[in-house]
Amino acid sequence: MKKKKALASLPYLVSIIFLPWWVSLSFNKCLETWVINWWNTRQSEIPLNDIQDKNVLEKFMELEELFLLDEMIKEYSETHMQRLHIGMHKETIQLVQRQNESHFHIILHFSTNLICFAILSGYFFLGNKELFIFNSWIQEFLYNLSDTIKAFSILLVTDLWIGFHSTHGWELMIGSIYNDFGLAQNDQIISGLVSTFPVILDTIVKYWIFHFLNRVSPSLVVIYHSMNE
């Protein structure tokens, strides 16, 4: 009976998987024009933060150095100096345009993700009954598994998420979150998150194994530690 109810709630779970993609695609198109108009009228009032300001200055200095180096090879005639100023002016305009596009995409992605989060929260709230049925079926399914399979599953999941080789996966995941919000990746922040977040998760898992599993199924804990060794 529970299995039939769980299968009946399966379309709801499938819709949860595809809903973020659909919301993101739809609202990106709907909000794009509005965000462009808002950005064009309000961008002069929005200050750059320290990281963005530093990036713009670094790009401008690199651009200036390249033009100066190119002109040093040539003769310093009046024509060449005019070309230098014209080239610098064009490249500066392009640099400002690229920076504006970067800010525009940050605002667009952030707004879309907020709307997506609000819609998903409401969807979870309205589908509370389906989630409860599916959760009951999952608990019954896991309870009927042998301790060996349970220990193997826990070991597999923990190794994938917080194991020695999980660093690259965390870098890709955090990088995808940065891209999803339209943010420029910061290697120092990503490195800090990769070095600390798995450690926190590892501590939580160890506490859960010690506090919960050791009380519910001591044999499972023994098998888990045997496999882990």
From Swiss-Prot:
Where are the membrane-spanning stretches?
Answer: 7-27, 106-126, 154-174, 189-209
Under catalytic activity, the entry for this protein gives: K(+)(in) + H(+)(out) = K(+)(out) + H(+)(in)
Alphabetical UniProt keywords: Antiport, Chloroplast, Hydrogen ion transport, Ion transport, Membrane, Plastid, Plastid inner membrane, Potassium, Potassium transport, Transmembrane, Transmembrane helix, Transport
One of the Pfam families matching this protein, by short name: CemA
Give this protein's Gene Ontology molecular function annotations.
antiporter activity; proton transmembrane transporter activity
Example GO CC term: the record gives:
chloroplast inner membrane
| Topology within the bilayer | Multi-pass membrane protein
Q: Does the keyword Transport apply?
A: yes
Where is it mostly found? plastid
The family database entries (HAMAP family) matched by this protein are listed as:
CemA_PxcA
What is stated as this protein's family in its record? Belongs to the CemA family.
Q: What is this protein called?
A: Potassium/proton antiporter CemA
Native source species: Phalaenopsis aphrodite subsp. formosana
Gene label: cemA
